[in-house]
Protein backbone atom coordinates (compact mmCIF):
# COMPACT_ATOMS: atom_id res chain seq x y z
CA UNK A 1 0.00 0.00 0.00
CA UNK A 2 1.26 3.48 -0.86
CA UNK A 3 2.59 5.78 1.86
CA UNK A 4 0.60 8.59 0.25
CA UNK A 5 -2.60 7.64 2.10
CA UNK A 6 -1.15 9.23 5.25
CA UNK A 7 -0.07 12.50 3.66
CA UNK A 8 -1.64 15.94 3.94
CA UNK A 9 0.47 17.43 1.12
CA UNK A 10 2.83 19.38 3.36
CA UNK A 11 5.48 16.70 3.86
CA UNK A 12 8.04 17.91 1.30
CA UNK A 13 7.93 21.41 2.76
CA UNK A 14 8.10 20.14 6.36
CA UNK A 15 11.17 18.01 5.57
CA UNK A 16 12.81 20.92 3.73
CA UNK A 17 12.28 23.29 6.67
CA UNK A 18 13.57 20.71 9.16
CA UNK A 19 16.68 20.02 7.06
CA UNK A 20 17.57 23.72 7.09
CA UNK A 21 16.65 24.40 10.72
CA UNK A 22 19.31 24.96 13.34
CA UNK A 23 16.79 24.72 16.19
CA UNK A 24 14.36 21.81 15.95
CA UNK A 25 13.27 21.92 19.58
CA UNK A 26 9.66 21.85 20.75
CA UNK A 27 9.84 25.56 21.57
CA UNK A 28 11.70 26.55 18.39
CA UNK A 29 11.09 30.14 17.28
CA UNK A 30 12.86 29.22 14.04
CA UNK A 31 10.28 26.55 13.19
CA UNK A 32 7.38 28.71 14.41
CA UNK A 33 8.44 31.39 11.92
CA UNK A 34 7.36 29.01 9.13
CA UNK A 35 3.76 28.75 10.34
CA UNK A 36 1.44 30.11 7.67
CA UNK A 37 -1.32 27.50 7.34
CA UNK A 38 -2.91 24.59 9.22
CA UNK A 39 -0.31 21.91 8.27
CA UNK A 40 2.62 24.10 9.34
CA UNK A 41 0.80 25.01 12.58
CA UNK A 42 0.28 21.29 13.21
CA UNK A 43 3.92 20.38 12.56
CA UNK A 44 5.69 23.48 13.95
CA UNK A 45 3.29 24.98 16.49
CA UNK A 46 4.32 25.02 20.14
CA UNK A 47 0.80 24.58 21.56
CA UNK A 48 0.37 21.01 20.33
CA UNK A 49 2.50 19.50 23.09
CA UNK A 50 0.54 21.34 25.82
CA UNK A 51 -1.75 18.31 25.97
CA UNK A 52 1.25 16.18 26.97
CA UNK A 53 2.38 18.30 29.92
CA UNK A 54 0.36 16.35 32.54
CA UNK A 55 2.25 13.17 31.59
CA UNK A 56 5.24 12.72 33.88
CA UNK A 57 8.22 11.77 31.77
CA UNK A 58 11.89 11.62 32.59
CA UNK A 59 14.94 9.41 32.54
CA UNK A 60 14.07 5.72 32.65
CA UNK A 61 10.61 6.21 31.13
CA UNK A 62 10.06 4.38 27.83
CA UNK A 63 7.61 5.93 25.37
CA UNK A 64 6.09 4.39 22.25
CA UNK A 65 4.84 6.99 19.75
CA UNK A 66 2.54 5.28 17.24
CA UNK A 67 1.88 7.32 14.11
CA UNK A 68 4.71 9.65 15.07
CA UNK A 69 4.23 11.92 12.07
CA UNK A 70 6.92 14.57 11.91
CA UNK A 71 8.14 13.74 15.42
CA UNK A 72 6.56 16.58 17.39
CA UNK A 73 5.45 14.42 20.33
CA UNK A 74 8.52 12.19 20.14
CA UNK A 75 10.77 15.25 20.32
CA UNK A 76 8.92 16.66 23.33
CA UNK A 77 9.01 13.32 25.19
CA UNK A 78 12.75 12.96 24.58
CA UNK A 79 13.34 16.56 25.73
CA UNK A 80 11.78 15.49 29.05
CA UNK A 81 14.42 12.74 29.29
CA UNK A 82 12.37 9.77 28.09
CA UNK A 83 13.61 7.08 25.73
CA UNK A 84 11.31 7.07 22.70
CA UNK A 85 10.50 4.47 20.06
CA UNK A 86 8.60 6.19 17.24
CA UNK A 87 6.78 4.31 14.49
CA UNK A 88 5.47 6.12 11.40
CA UNK A 89 3.66 4.58 8.45
CA UNK A 90 4.74 7.20 5.91
CA UNK A 91 8.37 7.34 4.74
CA UNK A 92 8.50 11.12 4.32
CA UNK A 93 6.95 11.75 7.72
CA UNK A 94 9.37 9.24 9.25
CA UNK A 95 12.22 11.19 7.63
CA UNK A 96 10.81 14.37 9.17
CA UNK A 97 10.69 12.67 12.58
CA UNK A 98 14.32 11.57 12.25
CA UNK A 99 15.32 15.15 11.44
CA UNK A 100 13.19 16.61 14.24
CA UNK A 101 14.62 14.21 16.83
CA UNK A 102 18.30 14.23 15.80
CA UNK A 103 20.59 14.12 18.82
CA UNK A 104 17.94 12.79 21.20
CA UNK A 105 17.16 9.30 22.51
CA UNK A 106 14.57 8.60 19.81
CA UNK A 107 14.53 5.56 17.55
CA UNK A 108 12.32 6.28 14.52
CA UNK A 109 11.19 3.51 12.22
CA UNK A 110 9.09 3.55 9.07
CA UNK A 111 6.49 0.82 9.19
CA UNK A 112 3.56 -0.52 11.14
CA UNK A 113 3.31 -0.71 14.92
CA UNK A 114 2.06 -4.27 14.46
CA UNK A 115 5.52 -5.19 13.15
CA UNK A 116 7.31 -3.72 16.16
CA UNK A 117 9.35 -6.19 18.18
CA UNK A 118 10.27 -4.87 21.61
CA UNK A 119 10.58 -7.09 24.64
CA UNK A 120 11.25 -4.28 27.12
CA UNK A 121 7.72 -2.83 27.12
CA UNK A 122 6.66 0.80 27.39
CA UNK A 123 5.51 3.03 30.21
CA UNK A 124 3.62 5.48 27.99
CA UNK A 125 2.02 5.12 24.56
CA UNK A 126 1.30 8.21 22.46
CA UNK A 127 -0.71 8.11 19.27
Residue ranges and their predicted role:
Residues 42-59:
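Conserved alpha-helix/loop element of class I SAM-dependent methyltransferases that forms part
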Residues 87, 124-127:
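Hydrophobic or amphipathic alpha-helical targeting/insertion segments
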